[in-house]
Amino acid sequence: MPSFDIVSEIDMQEVRNAVENATRDLGTRWDFRNVPASFELNEKDESIKVASESDFQVQQLLDILREKLSKRSIEGSALEIPEEMTHSGKTYSVDAKLKQGIESAQAKKLVKLIKDSKLKVQVQIQGDEVRVTGKSRDDLQGVMALVRGADLGQPFQFKNFRD
């Protein structure tokens, strides 16, 4: 029986490249001249710290970061940006987390979405991934289209296809 896994993974090398490109872009922008603004990638915590002098500039920096991530084929929904900014001294900062893996609540929503579609497939949660098994490839392709079309707030990839 054909099957595949639904996962949510981010290539950290691509994230590193996007952060480096955003930092390089920061040096060429005239509105950030002589302004202490920065991007810091923390690969252990899987987070990106964005810091600048004002909250408006932090929002601009986040837009630059999203643009560079999308050019590297990483969806903007892979970033979890908190509503509140940290303000210390004269710098504002935001610690944007990268979403890796499928949490159990998100996996349950995904399973419910697939089961409500009435496609003839079996769905199992296996740790931080979801396994989908069906009798035909057409059913599996229907599930893939359904998951791509659903807005679940997180990017999903499909891997481990078996016939």
UniProtKB/Swiss-Prot annotation:
Keywords tagged on the record: Nucleotide-binding
Full protein name: Nucleotide-binding protein Spro_1084
Coiled coil ranges: none
Record-linked Pfam families: DUF520
Keyword Nucleotide-binding listed: yes
PANTHER family in the record: UPF0234 PROTEIN YAJQ
Membrane-spanning residues: none
GO molecular function, one term: nucleotide binding
GO CC terms, sorted: cytosol
The keyword Nucleotide-binding is annotated on this UniProt entry: yes
Function comment: Nucleotide-binding protein.
Family label: Belongs to the YajQ family.
NCBIfam families, per database record: PRK05412.1
InterPro entries in the cross-refs: DUF520, UPF0234-like_C, UPF0234_N, YajQ-like_sf
